[in-house]
């Protein structure tokens, strides 16, 4: 920031002899400052500048009726959704290591980034049991291993594909209230099973073409005694 300009102290042209008493009289200073010349130019009157006109603001009329109860006005939401930036180390086909959750330590293949910012990954399921699922990029480690996924079609997969259908809960009657609740088992639709098989078939063709890649994806990642995570090269 630029340094603030220091204002110079005002120095009077009439030096003080004693505090409050100047060297020159009032009439002497009138001629010394040349005020007589300013008056002469303006017909014997000091010039006056017209005051600046204030900006005309629209007058807001007060409300005719005041509400009985004070109601807080909701704040305007000015937040604009921004697409989540993908890490430079994560590209389509990169093998990732999941760090948390049900499949912690599993190696998966990254397929694409969804509109929500989550990553679409799969094991594939036939190799290590990880199905098509969404993962936050904060909970994965990107490795230097790549898989060719040019033959995999992932256009139909989006966030709606993984959404759960909202089911309305029916109110229980008096007789059903005392009955033991039966837990409903969620059955995976056949359509999703077929989608998983189609992705697995395309991925396995690319994986089997690289030696030891299938065994690498099937092995679970773990740290042993003496291993330093910050010194590992993935």
Swiss-Prot record:
Gene Ontology cellular component terms for the protein in this record: cytosolic large ribosomal subunit
Instruction: Identify the CDD domains for this entry.
Output: KOW_RPL6
- Protein name, UniProt field: Large ribosomal subunit protein eL6
What processes in GO biological process is this protein linked to?
Answer: cytoplasmic translation; ribosomal large subunit assembly
Recorded family membership: Belongs to the eukaryotic ribosomal protein eL6 family.
List the keywords (alphabetical). Ribonucleoprotein, Ribosomal protein
- State one molecular function term (GO): structural constituent of ribosome
Record Pfam families:
Ribosomal_L6e, Ribosomal_L6e_N
What InterPro entries does the record tag this protein with?
A: 60S_ribosomal_eL6 (IPR000915), Rib_uL2_dom2 (IPR014722), Ribosomal_eL6_CS (IPR049633), Ribosomal_eL6_KOW (IPR041997), Ribosomal_uL6_N (IPR005568), Translation_prot_SH3-like_sf (IPR008991)
